[in-house]
């Protein structure tokens, strides 16, 4: 019996022995339910190496502290867990944006943006709660260049000055990925 998507789990343990015992226990319980663990997808790894899960890369990072060791009261950030989109997810998103902003598409900018917005909003909403501020800013700039490039190809005399950012985000309603991050609402 298969339950796609219903059995995605991450189990954290303090030691390798504890992790192996947890996998054995999970196998026994799932066998009673008529379900089995996928041998290629089930693995034990150290969080320092990181792992990929549901489109995210999760890893323990060593955050650079700008204060001397004596001034740091808490070591909570030294070994913090960081999650960010997988490279494959980012590439797939960029490919979808490329498909919708092809320079040969016979669309005006006002027609192109409503085609692009659902993709931007959906992808941005899924990843907005992890460490993506720099990534979203970079992707926002890249999307602007794609739109400007599309417009310039269609109308050679219309340079980027004729289509400023405030017009794209304001009048045309282009979704800004960085604006989806809760602490950065524009």
What are these regions (language model features)?
Residues 1-186:
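Non-catalytic terminal/accessory segments
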């Amino acid at each position: 019996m298969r339950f796609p998507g219903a059995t995605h789990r991450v189990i954290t343990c303090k030691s390798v022995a504890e992790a192996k015992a947890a996998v054995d226990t999970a196998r026994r319980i799932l066998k009673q339910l008529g379900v089995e663990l996928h041998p290629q997808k089930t693995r034990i790894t150290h969080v320092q190496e990181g792992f990929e899960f549901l489109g995210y890369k999760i890893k323990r990072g060593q955050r650079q502290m700008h204060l001397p060791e004596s001034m740091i009261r808490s070591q909570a950030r030294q070994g913090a867990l960081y999650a960010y989109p997988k490279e494959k997810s980012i590439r797939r998103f960029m490919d979808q944006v490329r498909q919708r902003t092809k320079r040969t598409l016979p669309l005006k900018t006002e027609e192109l943006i409503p085609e692009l917005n659902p993709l931007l909003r959906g992808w941005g909403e899924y990843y907005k709660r992890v460490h993506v501020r720099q990534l979203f800013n970079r992707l926002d700039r890249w999307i602007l260049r794609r739109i400007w490039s599309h417009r310039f190809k269609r109308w050679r005399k219309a340079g980027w000055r004729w289509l400023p950012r405030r017009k794209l985000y304001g009048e045309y309603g282009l979704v800004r990925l960085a604006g989806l991050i809760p602490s950065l609402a524009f």
